């Protein structure tokens, strides 16, 4: 199966470094900066056609995490065919005169698009009790550090 992309003026075709990679690298279509303690939305000038029965997730890259940047996860449903965008947040604290933000240039990889097959679920149903499991309702670190 191929994944169809429509490039708007200045958009860069997403790629995978290796055929077995989970995500398609998403590229910045222009230069920009994410200032410390700030968020920046980057329209990618790219549209994607997610096949029916699948969903696309915009995810961060580990190289950005090392710089104090978080990519806010985006969900792309199969019915959406408009321009996709990435939201980056810089967690670095403001320190006068030391470091004002992270600079990106046209063509930099800024996020990745991961495509996942959806489970075949009909509808949401309210019930009085859920099935018992080994884990139960333990969450938020209940299985260890």
List PLM regions with ranges:
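DUTPase catalytic domain/fold
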Residues: 1-145
């Amino acid at each position: 199966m191929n994944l169809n992309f429509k490039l708007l003026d200045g958009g860069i075709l997403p790629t995978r470094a290796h055929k077995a990679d989970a995500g398609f690298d998403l590229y910045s279509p222009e230069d920009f900066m994410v200032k410390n303690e700030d968020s920046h939305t980057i329209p990618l000038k790219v549209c994607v056609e997610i096949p029916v029965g699948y969903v696309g997730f915009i995810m961060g890259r580990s190289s950005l995490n090392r710089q104090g940047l978080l990519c806010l996860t985006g969900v792309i449903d199969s019915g959406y065919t408009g321009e996709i965008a990435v939201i980056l947040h810089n967690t670095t604290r403001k320190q006068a005169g030391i470091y004002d933000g992270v600079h990106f240039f046209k063509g930099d990889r800024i996020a990745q698009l991961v495509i996942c097959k959806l489970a075949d679920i009909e509808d949401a149903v309210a019930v009085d009790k859920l099935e018992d499991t080994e884990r139960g309702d333990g969450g938020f670190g209940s299985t260890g550090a």
